[in-house]
A protein has these predicted regions:
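The feature marks the mature, well-folded catalytic cores of soluble enzymes
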Residues: 1-286
Length: 286
């Protein structure tokens, strides 16, 4: 059995930064709260809980120190934290913070802002709060008509398109192309800001390449992780035997044994030890 591990598998910079800095904080103090999951990975969440991090769903449950997770938070969350007298430990991924600044800049310039992303994802929920009232989230091409109708009704002649950092590059390009075609005769100035981060893009590209060369493609990561699910979608288009797992316990050993070439890719919030555990199990089957 040949096992090929993707070079881009595992923690991205933003996740590694958030996890490492959280652990540093916990060495000195235990009464630290995190609003929502720091990153979308069950193993990481459990590890941080064991070290003393307290995860909450409502900021009113916190006292003293509050961590802002890697996905970022809505503008009003910061205001509320200050009103409550909380010490903010901001671990928002720098790539996400950059998008917030871009959104504020274009909102001040009077642009209508389209944010392409998963509507319920924490990053998208946070980013749209920086976009002002003249904005719309597009998750799929079915949302385009409504977004553009709002644009035309607003009588704004300037449009900028942004993206969630972990969105599918292929879907982003498809949506941008459809929007561009629709507004080409509408006298609207269009600016496209592909804010999908490089780590996401490279991971998606490598997954596409690797999944076309193997008999089985294993994607490791949280099932509610946006970037991990995108990798799984990409893998399935190239390899029928693509599977998404959170840990090595989920592998069907008897099924895996039947194949000669196994590819492995992991999401941006998947810890190294989860990847190593899968590899170790596969090696025992060789």
């Amino acid at each position: 059995m040949e096992i090929i591990i993707g070079k881009t598998a595992g923690f991205c910079f933003g996740v590694a930064n958030a996890v490492n800095k959280s652990k540093e904080q916990l060495k000195n103090k235990k009464n630290i709260f995190c609003l929502g999951e720091l990153v979308h990975n069950k193993q990481v969440t459990e590890e941080l809980e064991n070290e003393g991090l307290i995860f909450i769903d409502d900021i009113s449950e916190a006292n003293e120190d509050i961590i802002i997770r890697a996905h970022g938070e809505k503008k009003e969350t910061y205001s509320e934290a200050k009103k409550l007298g909380l010490n903010i430990i901001d671990l928002t991924c720098p790539k996400v913070t950059k998008i917030h600044k871009i959104a504020e800049e274009y909102e001040k310039k009077g642009y209508y802002i389209v944010l392409i992303g998963n509507k319920e994802h924490p990053e998208t929920v946070a980013t749209i709060s920086y976009c002002g009232n003249n904005s719309y989230i597009i998750e799929s091409k079915e949302d385009i008509d409504k977004a553009l109708q709002n644009l035309y009704n607003s009588q704004i002649s300037k449009l900028v398109i942004l993206s969630q950092t972990t969105f599918s590059l292929a879907k982003f390009n498809e949506i941008v192309q459809l929007i561009s075609k629709d507004i080409e005769d509408k006298n609207i100035d269009l600016e496209i800001k592909n804010t999908i981060c490089d780590a996401t893009r490279l991971r998606q590209e490598e997954t596409k390449e690797l999944s076309s060369k193997v008999d089985v493609m294993i994607i490791i990561g949280g099932r509610h992780s946006s970037n991990t699910n995108k990798l799984y979608e990409i893998a399935k288009t190239n390899c029928n035997n693509s599977i998404l797992i959170e840990s090595s316990d989920e592998l069907d050993k008897n099924e895996i044994k039947k194949h000669k070439k196994i590819g492995i890719m992991a999401g941006a919030s998947t810890p190294k030890k989860s990847i190593e555990s899968v590899v170790e199990m596969l090696k025992k089957l060789c």
